């Protein structure tokens, strides 16, 4: 008697691969049960729109062994498209709550990506302000001269004296102190650099007048702010900055001694006065003693440049001491400053470890 073997039919399924919009990219028939389906076509794409660009991420649902007919749909990650205006803050960008404004660019955060550092180390053509452009981002380098050897960057890297580091140039965030019909008085929310008020304790004679070390009109910090800082921070856009008539009268100095008071100045960038830092409508404590409202954090760049920094508890790391434009009547080398605990105190004009917290007046129509 003739023997017959049973015919075994393999179970197979149809696997369909679709793009985000339902377009069929590939159809695989006869996919055997218990095997893992594979997509063999071109990588799925999704066109960028005005706000986002899209990159293929994977499939939904997650690809698993075949146990039934299945449709897989391509999924994508989205990345917000940043315009040059936003990336470089070439124009003022007001926050949704109106409390801060991004405007200008300055070195701030240490670059600790070894691959990126190797790449930008090879750059040889700096921009006019000394920064380097790589893949749409600006970088600046500096030889570290920390105030203390124990200082670190925000990423935890120790700051070693004499070593050269790279820093990413990022939009400056300004605190809005006042807004009068679109004319804003704004103050940097971080300490951006380290600089002395004047580089000597000696007085000098200009136009037959004795000029003391704490004279703001003839100070090194005023020159630096309106030259080097201004030309770097606003190299890509400065149309909104107003030339400001700066009041340097005795009433702005926190006292009534006119000995060291200088003439009013006209500036595009300037330091706030003692009076500014005790004005409640600007958000500051009216007293001169310790106040959180005057706390201000140092940037990585500023710490590397030699600024004093100190943590005030766990919640306020790397707070800095910074200059005002106001002379202190204690002596001809004394200026008012804000210490790391937010108190208005005497600083010496020639100290190079003072932080810089600039302010500007801008017009937004």
Describe the role of every protein-language-model region.
Residues 1-6, 60-79, 345-356:
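Extracellular interaction modules
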Residues 11, 35-67:
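Surface-exposed interfaces of beta-sheet-rich extracellular modules
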Residues 11-16, 99:
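Short structural boundary motif marking the start of a folded domain
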Residues 14-34:
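Short, solvent-exposed loop/edge segments of extracellular or virion-exposed proteins
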Residues 17, 56-59, 174, 323:
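Signature tryptophan residues that serve as conserved aromatic anchors
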Residues 22, 30, 61-64, 79, ...:
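Disulfide-stabilized cysteine-rich extracellular repeat microdomains
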Residues 27-30, 71-73, 171-173:
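Well-ordered beta-strand positions in beta-sheet-rich domains
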Residues 81-365:
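Collagenous Gly-X-Y triple-helix signature in extracellular proteins
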């Amino acid at each position: 008697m003739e023997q017959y073997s049973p015919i075994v039919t393999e179970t197979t399924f149809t696997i369909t691969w679709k793009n985000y919009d339902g377009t069929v990219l590939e159809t695989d028939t006869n996919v055997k049960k218990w095997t893992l389906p594979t997509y063999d076509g071109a990588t799925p794409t999704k066109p960028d729109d005005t706000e986002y660009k899209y990159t293929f991420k994977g499939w939904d649902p997650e690809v698993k062994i075949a146990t039934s007919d299945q449709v897989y749909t391509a999924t994508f990650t989205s990345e917000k498209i940043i315009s040059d205006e936003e990336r470089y803050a070439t124009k003022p960008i007001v926050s949704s709550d109106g409390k801060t404004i991004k405007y200008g660019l300055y070195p701030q955060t240490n670059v600790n990506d070894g691959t990126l550092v190797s790449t930008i180390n090879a750059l040889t053509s700096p921009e006019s302000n000394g920064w380097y452009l790589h893949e749409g981002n600006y970088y600046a380098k500096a030889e570290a001269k920390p105030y203390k050897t124990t200082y670190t960057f925000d990423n935890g890297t120790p700051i070693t004296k004499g070593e050269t580091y790279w820093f990413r140039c990022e939009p400056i965030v300004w605190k809005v102190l006042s807004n009068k019909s679109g004319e804003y008085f704004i103050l940097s929310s971080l300490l951006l650099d380290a600089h002395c008020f004047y580089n000597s304790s000696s007085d000098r004679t200009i136009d037959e007048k004795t000029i003391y070390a704490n004279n703001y009109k003839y100070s090194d910090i005023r020159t630096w702010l309106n030259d080097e800082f201004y030309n770097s921070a606003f190299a890509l856009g400065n149309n909104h900055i107003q030339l400001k008539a700066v009041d340097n009268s005795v009433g702005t100095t926190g006292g009534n001694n006119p000995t060291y008071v200088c003439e009013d100045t006209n500036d595009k960038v300037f330091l706030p006065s003692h009076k500014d830092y005790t004005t409640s409508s600007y958000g500051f404590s009216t007293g001169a003693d310790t106040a959180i409202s005057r706390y201000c954090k140092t940037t990585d760049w500023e710490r590397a440049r030699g600024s004093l920094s100190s943590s005030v508890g766990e919640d306020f790391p790397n707070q800095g001491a910074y200059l005002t434009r106001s002379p202190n009547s204690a002596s001809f080398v004394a200026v008012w400053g804000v210490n790391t605990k937010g108190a208005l105190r005497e600083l010496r004009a020639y100290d190079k470890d003072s932080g810089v917290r600039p302010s500007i007046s801008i017009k937004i129509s």
